[in-house]
Regions:
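A short alpha-helical cap/connector motif
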Residues: 1-196
Length: 196
């Protein structure tokens, strides 16, 4: 499976915190969720989308579509958002570079994993079991890219435990992510991720 040629992503806290995502918040089903970086993850997600061009980004755990909207910030990328149950996003959010699917992403035979750079995981019931199964599935597939993992803080001890056991290079990006804890995991040895 092809990998990204040597790429370095330097997370710029100031740029993430200053990013204007108000146009996305206006389309959101939950406008009150679009808080500052460190309270809400959406500025981080939007900023990360600018680090890739002409790629596919997966949002696993649609709920009301906020993450999908944030990840769609860079309109040169396509976002596919997955959930097992419709919760209003597919009828309430209309954006050309966002597609909503009701299915397990692992069962989507149309995906080209060579062109997927970011996968965001935020699935219920936040027990760490599904997240670990998804990581193992991605490992078996030989996928290369970044995983965003939400709720890695002490409020969700099972996910925090899973986070602590991850052996891939990782960064706790809660400072510019969601207050419940946000982690960034690097599945690609040809790219490095660090703070600016």
């Amino acid at each position: 499976m092809p990998t990204v040629t040597e790429k370095t992503i330097k997370l710029d806290k100031a740029a993430i915190k200053a990013l204007d995502i108000s146009h996305l918040a206006e389309q959101s089903l939950n406008k009150n969720d679009w808080l500052t970086a460190g309270q809400s993850e959406y500025r981080l997600y939007a900023w990360l989308s600018t680090q890739f061009i002409n790629t596919t980004i997966l949002d696993v755990g649609t709920r009301t579509g906020g993450s999908a909207l944030a990840l769609s910030y860079n309109e040169k990328n396509n976002v596919i958002s997955y959930d097992l149950v419709e919760q209003g996003a597919s009828s309430g959010i209309k954006k050309d570079n966002v597609e909503f699917k009701i299915q397990d992403f692992r069962e989507d035979d149309t995906l080209d994993f060579d062109n997927i750079s970011i996968i965001m995981l935020d699935v219920d019931p936040h027990d760490g079991v599904q997240e670990e199964e998804m990581f193992e599935w991605l490992e078996e597939k030989g996928w290369k890219g970044l995983v965003l993992l939400d709720d890695i803080g002490p409020q969700w001890p099972e996910i925090e435990d899973f986070w602590n056991r991850i052996t891939y290079p990782k960064l706790n990006v809660t400072e510019v992510g969601h207050m419940s804890g946000t982690g960034l995991v690097n599945f690609d040895e040809k790219q490095t991720i660090s703070w600016l």
